[in-house]
Amino acid sequence: MMTVAGSDCSAGAGLQADMKAAHAMGAFALTAVTCVVSEAPGLVRGIQEVDPELVADQVRINLEHFPVSAV
């Protein structure tokens, strides 16, 4: 599977949470990072977007080189 999501430094949301959920179900999660977020429960301090072309390239390379069964 592949998750297309932001990176949450607290691991309570975003691709880190998606990866934990995938692991709990016995799946391996590829990622495409859309943004990096500085946050904690109830607080978002900063968001930095990833260039859309880089996000698209992450998706493409994952699809080209790995068996992706779900997105």
Where are these regions (language model features)?
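Residue-level recognition of alpha-helix initiation/capping sites
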Residues: 12-13, 53
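Conserved N-terminal subdomain of the carbohydrate kinase-like
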Residues: 1-3, 19-70
